Amino acid sequence: MSKSGVPRLLTASERERLEPFIDQIHYSPRYADDEYEYRHVMLPKAMLKAIPTDYFNPETGTLRILQEEEWRGLGITQSLGWEMYEVHVPEPHILLFKREKDYQMKFSQQRGG
């Protein structure tokens, strides 16, 4: 995210560099606690080298917390409501996501009336 809070979207050439890796992204099964549903997304390690440097936290060298538009731009596909909340620092290619438990049911009730 830029300093203005606006997501930093990929350029066409940046997106093109990531294309070969998209089919190799692995999604864990979902797991939950009383409040949230979780899953982790594992990027191919080589993909990290193709991601623009401003997507990384300069202090840790890991990906920073990305906004939805940013992680979707990397090729991560998930249903609505997921937010990236952490990078697994020992394995920086593993991104952690969460969403409110029962999000889909609540969302469909709001839309359906």
UniProtKB/Swiss-Prot annotation:
Protein family: Belongs to the CKS family.
This protein's UniProt keywords: Cell cycle, Cell division
Function: Binds to the catalytic subunit of the cyclin dependent kinase (cdc2) and is essential for its biological function.
Highest classification ranks of the organism: Eukaryota, Fungi, Dikarya, Ascomycota, Taphrinomycotina
Protein name: Cyclin-dependent kinases regulatory subunit
One annotated GO biological process: cell division
PANTHER family noted in UniProt: CYCLIN-DEPENDENT KINASES REGULATORY SUBUNIT/60S RIBOSOME SUBUNIT BIOGENESIS PROTEIN NIP7 (PTHR23415)
Subunit annotation: Homodimer (in presence of zinc).
Record flagged with keyword Cell wall biogenesis/degradation: no
Gene Ontology cellular-component terms listed: cyclin-dependent protein kinase holoenzyme complex; cytosol; nucleus; SCF ubiquitin ligase complex
Keyword Cell division annotated: yes
GO terms for MF: cyclin-dependent protein serine/threonine kinase activator activity; histone binding; protein kinase binding; protein-containing complex binding; ubiquitin binding; zinc ion binding
InterPro entries, alphabetized: Cyclin-dep_kinase_reg-sub (IPR000789), Cyclin-dep_kinase_reg-sub_sf (IPR036858)
Species of origin: Schizosaccharomyces pombe (strain 972 / ATCC 24843)
